[in-house]
């Protein structure tokens, strides 16, 4: 049985390989065989960790949406107006999607998978509540989600 360290290392290598392959070839054109080869893992290791290529996309989506507001905050400054922060975050997403056709495809894939849409909406709703609560007191994250 693989140790926790080995599993985490395999997971990191799979994610790294996927990011590189998805950006180079696109999500749809990247095969599981290519991921296995680039990551240097066996099929059983891959399927034990991720089960499908789609589950990797979900994890990458979660990472991206978990960090996008932090990155935007670093760009404009942590103490900036929250509405400006939201505008910068939105512009950052649009710019990234326009920079590279394969990156745009990743965004489209992420936004069309029901599991990912749910994740995106919930994470965005929490951030929108933080940003707009001064203007809409009494609103909760679910008010921005539902």
Each language-model region and where it sits:
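Helix-turn-helix
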Residues: 2, 13, 21-55, 59
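Short, Lys/Arg-enriched anionic-surface-contact patches
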Residues: 5-10
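Long, acidic, intrinsically disordered low-complexity segments
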Residues: 31, 41-44, 98-111
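Amphipathic, non-membrane alpha-helical segments in soluble helical-bundle scaffolds
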Residues: 54-58, 83, 87, 117-118, ...
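Hydrophobic alpha-helical connector segments
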Residues: 59, 73-103, 113, 121-125
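Short, basic, alpha-helical segments at the C-terminal edge of helix-turn-helix-like DNA-binding modules
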Residues: 61-69
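Amphipathic alpha-helical packing segments from all-alpha helical-bundle domains
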Residues: 111-146
């Amino acid at each position: 049985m693989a140790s926790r360290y080995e599993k985490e290392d395999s997971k990191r290598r799979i994610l790294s390989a996927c990011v590189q392959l998805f950006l180079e070839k696109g999500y749809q054109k990247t095969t599981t065989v290519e991921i296995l080869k680039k990551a240097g893992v066996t099929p059983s290791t891959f399927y034990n960790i991720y089960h499908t290529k789609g589950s990797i996309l979900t994890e990458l989506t979660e990472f991206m949406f978990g960090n996008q507001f932090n990155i935007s905050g670093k760009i404009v400054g942590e103490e900036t107006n929250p509405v400006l922060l939201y505008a910068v975050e939105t512009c950052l997403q649009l710019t990234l999607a326009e920079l590279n056709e394969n990156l745009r495809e990743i965004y489209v894939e992420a936004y069309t998978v029901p599991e990912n849409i749910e994740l995106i909406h919930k994470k965005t709703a929490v951030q929108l509540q933080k940003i707009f609560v001064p203007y809409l007191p009494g609103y909760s994250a679910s008010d921005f989600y539902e």
